[in-house]
């Protein structure tokens, strides 16, 4: 896993809707929550994605966007997003290059881990977490990390409703 206080590796990837995402485009504009998960439509991954969905407003209040990454193809991601009303995009990483770039490796080679990075507007990793089995543990830690460095925006910025 990459360590906090280090620069987040830049990348360009295709989102599930076919558009292109460039981490560099977020510099100076948005904080980024980049989370890696094993597979769409599995119980744990669905719970994790829905936890991010249920706290989307609270995370966005810190001027942050959420991006999910797994090895599933874009069409499966699109179906997963639609089925669970996910308000954030997903990146298809079938060859594992992005997972490798972010050192999100599992203890079991065929089982990708759950790793989440909180990246600030300057492209620096501010927090890194891994919880393979506590699937909803990432969101509270993401919110704590964002609260340490990013001011909440707007007078009615929503509070967290941690699910799970």
Residues covered by each model-derived region:
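Chalcogenol-based redox active-site neighborhoods
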Residues: 1-164
């Amino acid at each position: 896993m990459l360590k906090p206080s280090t620069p987040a590796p830049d990348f360009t990837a295709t989102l599930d809707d076919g558009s292109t995402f460039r981490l560099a485009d977020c510099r100076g504009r948005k904080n980024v929550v980049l989370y890696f998960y094993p597979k769409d439509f599995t119980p744990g991954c669905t719970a994790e994605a829905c936890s991010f969905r249920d706290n989307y407003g609270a995370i966005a209040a810190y001027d942050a966007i959420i991006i999910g990454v797994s090895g599933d193809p874009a069409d499966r991601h699109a179906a997963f997003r639609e089925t669970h009303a996910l308000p954030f995009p997903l990146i298809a990483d079938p060859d594992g290059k992005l997972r490798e770039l972010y050192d999100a490796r599992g203890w079991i080679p065929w089982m990708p881990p759950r790793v989440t990075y909180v990246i600030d507007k300057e492209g620096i990793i501010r927090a890194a977490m891994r919880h393979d089995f506590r699937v909803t543990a990432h969101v509270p830690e993401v919110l704590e990390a964002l609260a340490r460095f990013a001011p909440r925006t707007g007078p009615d910025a929503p509070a967290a409703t941690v699910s799970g």
